[in-house]
A protein has these predicted regions:
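Catalytic cores of alpha/beta
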Residues: 8-12, 47-54, 91-107
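Glycine-rich phosphate-binding active-site loops on the catalytic face of alpha/beta enzymes
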Residues: 22-27, 60-68, 103-126
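Catalytic alpha/beta core domains of metabolic enzymes, predominantly
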Residues: 43, 52-58, 72, 84, ...
Length: 139
């Protein structure tokens, strides 16, 4: 959600998380009030710490492709250990290992699985490639 009122709409979908594109402290606060886990988008340490001060314990590094696993490694050195960081944007099965090695807890994946006009078979194939890569990382 981009605005606190949009967070209210998520309750009707029975969601447990509230993913947003930026570090909007009002959205984080409203998500917490509603019992949702906020996952704000951040790109700088300043944004990350603002989100943490507002109550977020999960952060979406976006767009991750404009940063790097080295960025994550540096952030992990200063972020509280209880804060999870997720790479979103530009993640591929081939680069997941580097992100995990640097300290991400997981990924948000969209356009590398689904593109407008894609067939169900194409989407399924792409999703399976990510699942296979993730399972290989966890074994």
């Amino acid at each position: 959600p981009f605005f606190p009122a949009m967070t209210d709409d998520q309750i009707e979908t029975y969601t447990q998380i509230s993913v947003s594109p930026d570090c909007n402290e009002a959205v984080i606060a409203r998500a917490k009030e509603l019992g949702l886990e906020p996952v704000p988008g951040v790109f700088t340490p300043t944004e990350a710490f603002a989100a943490i001060r507002a109550g977020a314990t999960h952060l979406k590094l976006f767009p991750a492709e404009a940063a790097s696993p080295l960025t994550v490694k540096a952030w992990r050195a200063v972020l509280p250990k209880h804060v999870s960081l997720y790479a979103v944007g530009g993640v591929t099965p081939a680069n997941m290992q580097g992100w995990v090695d640097a300290g991400v807890a997981g990924f948000g994946i969209g356009s590398n699985i689904y593109k407008q006009g894609a067939t169900a078979a194409t989407v399924a194939k792409a999703a399976k490639e990510f699942i296979t890569a993730w399972r290989a990382l966890k074994s």
